[in-house]
Amino acid sequence: WDTPWSYRLYKCLEQIQTEYVIFLMDDFILTDYVDQEEIEKDISYMENDKTIACFNYLPIPGEPEAIKYDRYMQMPKKTPFRINLQAALWRKSYLMKFIRKHENPWQFENWGSIRARRYSDKIYHLRKDAKRVFIYPDGGIIADERWHTEAAVELLKKEGYNIDFSARTIYHKGDARKTEIVHRTFIQKCWQVFKSLI
């Protein structure tokens, strides 16, 4: 596990032969059927417009620049978390272009959103009032190595999972998040930020 998360993701993507990939984190527990018809439509949109990088299947806060394909928003380039790790249909080559191999997931979302400002690739997010394509607890069921809210725990119990709270506690909104590797020196942190921005 010493290998950075984004390096492992990049190597995994290298082995996938398809032009498009559906990205789901391993703690996204689906609670309803997937809208396969919508995914197929989105693939056809991407085939007809090679500048579409991603259909992100979770709305993000902010005012859209435009509404596209009825149920998607095109957000301004400076929108925070315009690049994120929620359920999405990606053009594989574009996803690989956004990856920096030293980053953890939080850095990828933060710095990746800043990097994406340089590119003209189109990134669409589901409208807030649109039917969800993938239905799962927002943010997944794990947050910073803890159970992500009591609601996530209740979902697992409902599905028959026996939860050991001695091994993993519950994350509460407002708790500090462990998004940094604390043992790095100031110079190492600066170097990592530099690598993230190129």
Model-flagged regions — what are they?
Residues 1-18:
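Active-site-proximal specificity loops/subdomain of glycosyltransferases
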Residues 19-29:
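Short beta-strand-to-loop acidic/aromatic patch adjacent to the donor-nucleotide binding site
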Residues 22-23, 53-58, 89, 123-127:
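A structural signal for short, well-ordered beta-strand segments and their strand-loop junctions
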Residues 33-59:
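Conserved donor-nucleotide/metal-binding helix-loop-beta segment in metal-dependent transferases, i.e.
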Residues 65-80:
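Short, flexible, basic/aromatic active-site loop/helix in glycosyltransferases
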Residues 83-147:
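Catalytic core and acceptor-binding pocket of nucleotide-sugar-dependent glycosyltransferases
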Residues 157-198:
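Membrane-proximal basic amphipathic "stem/tether" segments
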